[in-house]
Amino acid sequence: MLYSKIMVPYDGSEHAKHALEYAKGLAAISDAKIAIVHVVPSGVMGVDQIGTEGSLDGVPLGMLNYEQYEGVVRAALDQAKEKVTENLAGLVEDIANIVTIDVVAGTAPAEALARYADKNGCDLIVMGRRGLGAIRGMLGSVSFGLLRSTDVPVLTVK
């Protein structure tokens, strides 16, 4: 068996979609599972604002206890997973039996992806060369950061 678990970071970009198609081909010849992983910036969920003025889902940030905050984060991750799953609908129907879709939070996407790969036993990462915000002609910052953050082989796809 060449690979057993291939991780595909997914941000909805064309490069991410191409990476998924490439990973599907690799999975077919190596009988591997595919983990599609989307990173939600933790700042979107108010991580950097806890204990300050303002509110998150109508609850004053200074009054959130751990359980309340955990519930808000879980709801944000669930909502993001729902959107990603909808976005992937036409792309994963043919591999539904070997694919999982996960959403993780992190302040740095590359580090969050590296942690996921290490924690979940991924033996290959197939990702787009550039994401939604990358400058044309350059290796994306997440791709570059992931290369430095993990020992798992990273294959970038145009």
What are these regions (language model features)?
Residues 51-55, 118-119, 143-145:
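Short, hinge-like loop/turn segments at secondary-structure boundaries
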Residues 38, 128-130, 158:
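Short secondary-structure boundary segments
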Residues 1, 82, 86-125:
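Structural beta-alpha unit
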Residues 19, 46-49, 111-114, 137-138:
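Short, well-ordered secondary-structure micro-motifs
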Residues 61-76, 99:
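Short glycine/proline- and acidic residue-enriched helix-loop micro-motifs
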Residues 4, 123, 151:
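Conserved acidic residues
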Residues 124-145:
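Glycine-rich, Arg-bearing micro-motifs that act as flexible, cationic patches
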Residues 2-66, 93:
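Small/aliphatic-rich secondary-structure junction motif
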